[in-house]
Amino acid sequence: MAIFDNYEVWFVIGSQHLYGPETLRQVTQHAEHVVNALNTEAKLPYKLVLKPLGTTPDEITAICRDANYDDRCAGLVVWLHTFSPAKMWINGLTMLNKPLLQFHTQFNAALPWDSIDMDFMNLNQTAHGGREFGFIGARMRQQHAVVTGHWQDKQAHERIGSWMRQAVSKQDTRHLKVCRFGDNMREVAVTDGDKVAAQIKFGFSVNTWAVGYLVQVVNSISDGDVNALVDEYESCYTMTPATQIHGEKRQNVLEAARIELGMKRFLEQGGFHAFTTTFEDLHGLKQLPGLPVQRLMQQGYGFAGEGDWKTAALLRIMKVMSTGLQGGTSFMEDYTYHFEKGNDLVLGSHMLEVCPSIAVEEKPILDVQHLGIGGKDDPARLIFNTQTGPAIVASLIDLGDRYRLLVNCIDTVKTPHSLPKLPVANALWKAQPDLPTASEAWILAGGAHHTVFSHALNLNDMRQFAEMHDIEITVIDNDTRLPAFKDALRWNEVYYGFRR
């Protein structure tokens, strides 16, 4: 996704005039050195932009106000180089609506034991300047992140980079438009929800477009464009005999390409970066979009089936969060179980729509097979197995008075047998801490059957996401025990009830 050049993060130094112009000159020099080094050596995902020193209430307020109105600014990293009285920050922080991180660092790593004097002490006061700043954040009940460590420390770099991804994701989410082609799958509860509340909370908008509008665009795609895209299919995928030239399902592949081009044109023209479909609302389309959806997800679009706009939005958000990281992120569904003593497994898939970003390295297979649901022509799809290793599945649900994010840590494993009659992409995993505990906890917490599956992101990423958006998070991992989990659900009811 071309998102790296769209955003930057501002680096703000807090100080005061108490120490005189020479100290402020040194503070500025240190700040310039640190920012230049971080931009060139720390492998941060986004550029740090140094702003003028914040030494008075008016200066700080101006920086925060400017940050709010600059669409390129994804958030603020604040370094309290000297002591910076926190009352100076109140007006600015009151109006700030961008993510905030305090980098609790100092210019020197080691103390100069033989030469340290009070001038050095006054210049390098992060140790208590950061605490003063932390107090005002706590007093104002303002959520902000804190990273402690020397500015040359790789772990600090990684944590700042992770926070940057969250900040950019939040900014991107404020501009996110979700298109629903048709409505929800009829009578399904968890895919429904309050779209107005979601826009107030997260910033993304959700609107429905009749499938007929999409069909008009699909039908306008030229044969030349279709053939060019099919040539791309030929080079990227292993085509089954039925899908090759003169194959009995070749026309289905051509139609899938036409749908993909039409969908992408519709989404681009509308400024949409997430969308849903439903097999119950396909009037005018010749097949359920399988291959088109898979390829659009791989390009960074959020998607979910059956009108599930919350999961579609979450997928787009998590794709932005994971931009540039190794591993993929996909729409997923817990489909069926393998019960075996000590080796319980979950087979995840969907009817067609699993993102190739999570596939093993070899070329996916492009095939056309019968689909009994939807009542349309046989759809094209990519078939592949998934990479192994640690992963997460996440679900965002609407509880009426709040949103709850559920995260289950999992371990993806290799499929022990071939699946010759299962013509869909799939993932096989062990749920942590075990399948009975994980499934019971998930069900008790109201988790959806649709999830976002990710090898690229981890539990810490999702904790940051929940904190930044001020929503509840419920975690199921190797530390989960059902009695304590149930207690936590009850305590959360009380806590969030008091906050209403």
From Swiss-Prot:
Record-level GO BP terms: L-arabinose catabolic process to xylulose 5-phosphate
Keyword check for Metal-binding: yes
Coiled-coil intervals: none
Cofactor(s) it depends on: Mn(2+)
Top-rank EC class of the record's enzyme: isomerase
GO molecular function annotations of the record: L-arabinose isomerase activity; manganese ion binding
Residues holding Mn(2+): 306, 333, 350, 450
Keywords, sorted A to Z: Arabinose catabolism, Carbohydrate metabolism, Isomerase, Manganese, Metal-binding
Region forming the signal peptide: none
Catalytic activity: beta-L-arabinopyranose = L-ribulose
Cofactor details (free text): Binds 1 Mn(2+) ion per subunit.
EC number: 5.3.1.4
Gene3D superfamilies: 3.40.50.10940
GO cellular component: cytosol
Associated pathway: Carbohydrate degradation; L-arabinose degradation via L-ribulose; D-xylulose 5-phosphate from L-arabinose (bacterial route): step 1/3
Summary of the function given for this chain in its UniProt record: Catalyzes the conversion of L-arabinose to L-ribulose.
PANTHER family recorded: L-ARABINOSE ISOMERASE
Family membership: Belongs to the arabinose isomerase family.
Subunit and partners: Homohexamer.
Name of the protein described by the UniProt record: L-arabinose isomerase
Species annotation: Shigella flexneri
Source species taxonomy: Bacteria, Pseudomonadati, Pseudomonadota, Gammaproteobacteria, Enterobacterales
Originating gene: araA
